[in-house]
C-alpha cells in the first residue's frame, strides 16, 4: 500500500512550497492530457527511493476554535488517514500559540509525527529551532524547503521506519527512470500472471453520484451500512466476487459512512481513500451524475486515475427519468470536456434500476485485457518504423532524430520504451503523434498508453580524440597565423 504523508501547520510556514517541491517530479505525467484539472492539494511523489501520496492539508489556524470548526474538517480527516504527519513550523517566526494548539491536537491523535522547522536558511538554525523541542513531539528536523535543503533527509527519516514495518521495498532511482526490457519469455510470463489474477475494480466518484447503489446492484445484495468507529476510516472495503467465470475484487470507496450532527447518514468522501483505491486498482470506474454534468471534482478524480496509469471506464449514472434535451446537453458536454480521453468507453446507466449495468463489465474486461496484452518487440519496432515512414521525426540542429527500436516496458498501463538518438529533443507534438499511432495500431481501448524514450549510448561522448604529431603541428601553425593577423 502506498504511504500517505500529510503536511500540517499554520498558514505561511511553507507547506505549499514543500508540496510543490515533492510533487514536481510527477507533473510530467499529467502534462500529456491537456484540459485536465489538477488538484494542488493532493499529489503523487517519488523521492529518496519511495513513492508516496503527499497532502497539503491547509485550513488549520491552530486555535482551539479553529480546530473544531467545520472548515477544518477535511484537514483533520487528512491527518486521521495519513500514515506520516510532517508538522511544519516557521523557524524565523519562532514558536507561536497556534503551533502549541496544533501540537496538542496531534499528540491526542497519537499519529506518527515529525516536527519540521522550515526557513532555516540565513539564520542560526540550531538556536532558532531549540524552542520547538518543547512541543513534546520528539526531534526537530531543520529544512529550507524553498532551496530544497533537508528535504531528502526528512523524507528518509519519515518513511524508512514506516516502509520497513509495512514491508515496502525501497526502489532505486534507476528502477524508476529506466524501464525494464523484457525478454519474450519474461513478457509472456508477466502477461499470463496478470491475466490469472482477479481484476481489481475501484468505483470512484464525488459524493452522492450513486457509488453505493451501483456496488449493491453489482453484488446483488444490500450492503450493511458501516458507521465510523476507531480503526474503520483508514481503508476502502475489498469485496471479492465472480461474474461469468471471471474473478473480481470490488474496491468500495463509499463503504464507510458517518452520522452528521443532525443524525442523517451521509456519504463520507475522502480524497485520500480514493487515491489509495486508485493506486491499488487495475481498472477504475468513474461515476458521473447525469443531472449535474461534468464537475471540476470529476476532472480531479479523473486526473488521479490517469496519473496512476489505470485502465478507465466512465459511467454516467441517473440516466433514467431525464428528458431528451438534458441528455443531448450532457452528451455534448462529455464530448467537449472529456475529448482528451477518447480511449475510454462511456456508458449511460441507472444504478437504481439496473439499466446498462451489465454492459459495464464488457468494457471493464476489454480495458483490462488491453492494459495487459502482450506485444512482441518485433511488432512494436515495426509499428515505430511505420510511424516514422508516415511522418518523419523533426530535424534537431540539422540532424534528424533517429528512432532505433522499441520494446515493452511494463503493463497496466502498457509502456512502450523507444530507443534512439536525440530522442530527448523530440517535441511533445511528435510524442503525442506516436502515442496515438501506437494506440490505433495496437487497437488499445480503455487504458492510457505510455511512451518512454531512451537515448542510445554514444561511445564517443565526453571523449576527445588525441591529435597526431602532424595534426598538432598544423594546429600550432594555424593558431600562429590567426595571432599574426590580429596583431596587424
Swiss-Prot record:
GTP 2 binds at residues 205-212, 252-256, 317-320. Keywords: GTP-binding, Nucleotide-binding, Repeat, Ribosome biogenesis. Residues 373-457 form the KH-like domain. One of its GO terms (molecular function) is ribosome binding. Transmembrane segments: none annotated. Pfam families: KH_dom-like, MMR_HSR1. CDD domains: EngA1, EngA2. Residues 473-488 have a biased composition (Basic residues). Residues 469-488 are annotated as: Disordered. Residues 3-166, 199-372 form the EngA-type G domain. One of its GO terms (biological process) is ribosome biogenesis. InterPro entries: G_ENGA, GTP-bd, GTPase_Der, KH_dom-like, KH_dom-like_a/b, P-loop_NTPase, Small_GTP-bd. GTP 1 binds at residues 9-16, 56-60, 118-121. PANTHER family: GTPASE DER. Belongs to the TRAFAC class TrmE-Era-EngA-EngB-Septin-like GTPase superfamily. EngA (Der) GTPase family. GTPase that plays an essential role in the late steps of ribosome biogenesis. Associates with the 50S ribosomal subunit. This is GTPase Der. The gene is der.
